Amino acid sequence: MKNTFLNTVKGSLIISCQALPNEPLHSSFIMSRMALAAKGAGAAGIRANSVVDIQAIQDEVDLPLIGLSKVDYPDSPVYITPTIKEMRAVAATGCAVVACDVTGQPRPNGEKLAEIVATMRTEFPDTLLMADTDTIENVKVADKLGFDIIGTTMHGYTPATTGANIADNDFAYLKEVLQATSRPVIAEGKVDTPEKMKRCLDLGCHAVVVGGAITRPLEIAQRFISAL
């Protein structure tokens, strides 16, 4: 199954279908239809948040999924599949990939990332693990821990990378990431135009995830309204 996912999405677009509780489209049904639209457009895969959304999407489309679970804990800034509890729950859906935060910030309950990875390898040996990283240092951490896929997801979204954009200086950061690891790299985070997606692939990314620019109509509309 591991090679199947990587082969399926190689050189392609993965569409993130997510809506948090404070967003207008927050609904597992709506996310499943968003995934159906993504499939109709030719997406090679879907990235989805929460067990209920993942299951609803699986019922609607047969595309491979990157699953995650966003949960806020009072004792940690980490919120993307932060503990072994969420990792297990997402993996149990049968999604091809489980994504989690790899930003070096303290996890809830004092959990250690290395222990989480070891547990997942034992309990879900066929599930790919994707590292949502923010810096080159954490790309190297993820590589050393044996993550199957390196994502640039958190670049620009952590205290260490505030204000950063993947497209800055002709994608200089992404080029560094590609030099720092031999594992498949999936570009994600602020890839908001077809041209940026194509550039990521041309530079050597295995695939690209696009979310907000496609599946968040409130944000899309705001871009137009702000230009008035």
UniProtKB/Swiss-Prot annotation:
<comment type="pathway">
    <text>Amino-sugar metabolism; N-acetylneuraminate degradation; D-fructose 6-phosphate from N-acetylneuraminate: step 3/5.</text>
</comment>
<dbReference type="GO" id="GO:0006053">
    <property type="term" value="P:N-acetylmannosamine catabolic process"/>
</dbReference>
<keyword id="KW-0413">Isomerase</keyword>
<keyword id="KW-0119">Carbohydrate metabolism</keyword>
<dbReference type="GO" id="GO:0019262">
    <property type="term" value="P:N-acetylneuraminate catabolic process"/>
</dbReference>
<dbReference type="InterPro" id="IPR011060">
    <property type="entry name" value="RibuloseP-bd_barrel"/>
</dbReference>
<comment type="function">
    <text>Converts N-acetylmannosamine-6-phosphate (ManNAc-6-P) to N-acetylglucosamine-6-phosphate (GlcNAc-6-P).</text>
</comment>
<protein>
    <recommendedName>
        <fullName>Putative N-acetylmannosamine-6-phosphate 2-epimerase</fullName>
        <ecNumber>5.1.3.9</ecNumber>
    </recommendedName>
</protein>
<dbReference type="GO" id="GO:0047465">
    <property type="term" value="F:N-acylglucosamine-6-phosphate 2-epimerase activity"/>
</dbReference>
<dbReference type="InterPro" id="IPR013785">
    <property type="entry name" value="Aldolase_TIM"/>
</dbReference>
<dbReference type="InterPro" id="IPR007260">
    <property type="entry name" value="NanE"/>
</dbReference>
<dbReference type="GO" id="GO:0005829">
    <property type="term" value="C:cytosol"/>
</dbReference>
<dbReference type="GO" id="GO:0005975">
    <property type="term" value="P:carbohydrate metabolic process"/>
</dbReference>
<dbReference type="Pfam" id="PF04131">
    <property type="entry name" value="NanE"/>
</dbReference>
<comment type="similarity">
    <text>Belongs to the NanE family.</text>
</comment>
